[in-house]
Regions:
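Solvent-exposed adhesion/ligand-recognition segments of exported proteins
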Residues: 4-27, 31, 44, 49, ...
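Chymotrypsin/trypsin-fold serine protease catalytic domain
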Residues: 154-245, 249
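Tryptophan-rich substrate-binding surfaces of secreted polymer-degrading and adhesive proteins
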Residues: 530-606
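Conserved H-D interstitial segment of serine endopeptidase catalytic domains
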Residues: 118-121, 126-165
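C-terminal subregion of chymotrypsin/trypsin-like serine protease catalytic domains
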Residues: 53-83, 106-114, 118, 122-124, ...
Length: 717
């Protein structure tokens, strides 16, 4: 057996979504061993109306693209990154820890400075944006308010929801940015029209719209709240090994500064100007911190403080018609504001303090873009099934909030902050969850035999965790992992998936409990109950002339007497009168029983929708056994993430592949022939194969017993 699966590029993730490549055929006997498979502003000063940059023509252009998207070698936190020219010669080293550019929007012109706000320039329409995406293009967030500075080319944007995919940029600047002993590196990123520049000064346009980035030399203060540098002096070593000059169109894009004393990156400014296409100097606007503080502060209602010495709980009432509510404890009353006549920006943020606060929600609350932030432990309950929707919840580090409130259908609760949110409402929660940081523990209480904590769950950001505490808390197939993923801790519960929706290696299913879990991966491209089958009648035109239809559709006819059912195999069929129904290339006989015919139609749709291989890019970790039965459609499961479990993995029929993963480069279609692959490790107790083929492919390392029976095969390499 020597199977090769094609590599496919995903526009969603900007990289590889599948690859299986087996280069050598080695039959293996069962037994414990370590197995390895690897192959080896004057007239000359221009505001920037769109997005662009100029970079060196001597360095592979892919390097600048990878840099801006944290792809290739530019993973956040990486140090000692060697930069090479097109001939493979070292031209410099990035010594400081690589910045995390996730705070930069996919268009490059807006930077997240808190989970609910982003900054940019004002000119060229940047002060009037409607939305921005982070992580992947599909993670699109609506802007509800564009705050435009009256005296500066600066805008501050408020989002309708807390951003869960990205970590906001720090804006704390201490000391002088021009002090090269403190601020030892400056990086930028932007998107759009691009140029490469030769030493002669000749520039060549690179078509396409995409993020690029690079280094900038130590800036100087140039007055009018501006700092300046000359990254357009591309081959001057003072601009760093990846000099990147903001060209016409790079307005609003960020400049980051590395503080060697605090060992942190901070947002230094937003791009405003350059000195023309062939110029050298860029100007960045320093962030107007007082303006930012005042705008965000104005979006908060007064701080809510729980009096722990009172015998009374807080009572939260809300008048939806007026968009005004009250949170009251004894004679202490706090006024809050929510969505008013569809204006999400009318909703204010709420900040809660006071130890062990308890709130009883009395009315349904739509807080618009307003979010809740908890600095202390709180319990939020409802005695009358009231719901809450809004911008989301921030739970501060070291804080635990018990949340007994259900959401509303079609709306997601966005949770960020390093603290813990315990979901302990009652019955089926029609709302969804998006988590970007911290922990959410699910212990929803049962009502009407339903304890579904959320209708759907999306785990993103890389540092987030959803932990099951009660039974039947999730609909497994409605769990997905977004940008950089996070952890689903099944916590000793037995869980079955028919689909694994993970877009990158950050996704993880784990069991942290001492109670062993059984994880069943009964994967299917679709579920039968998701497939609708209608029965069409073959009319007289079809009888005499034939007709057109959709392959897979179910038809009925009494042409041969009692009702018979047929499945169409082609989009065009001939005359029934002339014997078309007997043509097995056009029709499949489905019998005379309607239920059996419908079931056959569903099975055919399941098979036809199956991909070449089921794929999981994430991790499987902890105290669990994993069972993979015979799968619907193409019974091949490729794991190119990693496995580290204390128990067994069992595969019935079909094929199982462990393999490494090609390094993802920004915007580049990967191939099996590329030289850079990431190693993956697979550690387990026993791999049990029953009439199944197992392949340990390139860049995969396995530690465990293999027990193969019933004509199973083992291939290494």
């Amino acid at each position: 057996m020597n199977k090769i699966y094609s590599l496919k590029y995903s526009s969603l993730t900007g990289g590889l979504i599948a690859v299986s490549e087996l280069s050598k055929k080695v039959k293996g006997k069962t037994g414990r061993k370590l197995m390895t498979a690897s192959v080896a502003l004057s007239v000359s000063l221009s505001a920037l109306p769109a997005e662009a940059s100029t970079v060196s023509a001597e360095i592979p252009y892919q390097t600048f693209r990878d840099f801006a998207e944290n792809k290739g070698v530019f993973t956040p936190g990486a140090t000692g990154i060697e930069i090479k020219d097109k001939n493979g010669n070292a031209v410099g080293t990035l010594d400081v820890p690589m910045i995390d550019f996730s705070s930069v929007s996919r268009r490059g012109s807006l930077t997240l400075l808190s989970q609910g706000y982003g900054v940019s320039a004002k000119h060229g329409g940047l002060g009037d944006v409607n939305n921005a995406s982070f992580g992947y293009d599909k993670n699109n967030y609506t802007v509800v308010k564009n705050n435009k500075h009256s005296g500066l080319d600066f805008s501050l944007h408020r989002f309708s929801k807390l951003i869960t995919e990205a970590a906001p940029a720090d804006i704390n600047i201490s000391g002088q940015l021009s002090d090269s002993s403190q601020y030892t590196a400056f990086y930028r990123a932007g998107a759009g029209t691009q140029y490469i520049k030769e030493r002669s000064g000749k520039q060549t346009h690179i078509p396409g719209t995409f993020l690029t980035g690079g280094t900038v030399g130590t800036p100087w203060y140039s007055g009018n709240n501006l700092i300046s540098s000359s990254p357009g002096d591309t081959y001057n070593k003072s601009q760093g090994p990846l000099a990147s000059y903001g060209q016409m169109g790079d307005s609003g894009s960020p400049l980051f500064a590395y503080n060697s004393l605090s060992e942190k990156w901070s947002l230094a400014g937003v791009t405003l100007h350059n000195n023309g296409v062939n110029g050298q100097k860029n100007n960045w606007l320093l962030l107007p911190e007082d303006y930012i503080k005042n705008i965000i502060t104005a979006d908060f209602d007064p701080i809510i403080s729980f009096n722990k010495n009172s015998k009374e709980h807080m009572s939260w009432t809300y008048d939806a018609a007026k968009g005004v509510g009250r949170i009251q404890q004894d004679d202490q009353q706090f006024v809050m504001h929510g969505n008013l006549n569809g204006n999400l920006n009318a909703g204010k943020n709420l900040y809660f303090t006071g130890e062990n606060g308890i709130i009883d929600l009395k009315d349904n609350v739509n807080q618009g873009a307003g979010y809740l932030q908890f600095a202390d432990d709180y319990t939020v309950t409802t005695s009358n099934d009231s719901s809450w929707s809004g911008g989301g919840i921030i739970v501060n580090y070291g804080t635990t909030v018990k949340w007994g409130i259900n959401g509303v259908s079609g709306d997601d609760l966005h949770k960020v902050g390093d603290g813990t949110l315990i979901i302990n409402g009652t019955g089926k929660n029609e709302g969804g969850l998006k988590i970007g940081a911290g922990t959410v523990i699910l212990e929803q209480k049962e009502k009407n035999n339903d304890s579904t904590a959320f209708s759907s769950i999306n785990i993103s950001g890389g540092n987030s965790r959803v932990k099951l505490s009660g039974d039947n808390q999730i609909i497994p197939d409605n769990v997905s992992w977004g940008f950089r993923g996070g952890y689903l801790d099944i916590n000793g519960k037995n869980t079955e998936f028919s689909r694994l929706q993970a877009v990158d290696y950050g996704a993880a299913i784990i069991n942290s409990s001492t109670d062993k879990s059984l994880l069943t991966l009964n994967l299917s491209p679709l579920k039968k109950d998701e497939i609708a089958v209608s029965v069409k009648a073959l009319d007289m035109n079809a009888i005499f002339q034939g007709g057109h239809g959709t392959a897979g559709d179910l038809y009925k006819t009494t042409f041969y007497g009692p009702t018979q059912y047929y499945l169409l195999k082609k989009p065009k069929f001939g005359s029934v009168l002339m014997g078309s129904l007997k043509n097995t290339s056009e029709w499949q006989f489905a019998g005379t029983d309607l239920n059996q015919a419908v079931d056959m139609a569903k099975n055919n749709k399941l098979t036809s929708s199956a991909q070449a291989s089921y794929l999981y890019h994430g991790k499987l970790l902890g105290n669990m056994d994993i069972v993979i039965p015979e799968l619907t459609g193409n019974d091949i499961l490729t794991l190119d993430g990693s496995v580290s479990i204390s128990g067994d993995m069992s595969k019935q029929d079909g094929a199982l592949i462990f393999q490494g993963h090609p390094v993802i480069h920004a915007g580049q279609t990967v191939s099996a022939s590329q030289s850079d692959w990431e190693n993956r490790e697979f550690s387990l107790n026993n791999l049990n194969l029953n009439n199944a083929d197992f392949s340990l492919s390139r860049n995969a390392f396995m530690n465990g017993n293999i027990r193969a029976v019933n004509q199973s095969t083992v291939i290494i390499g």
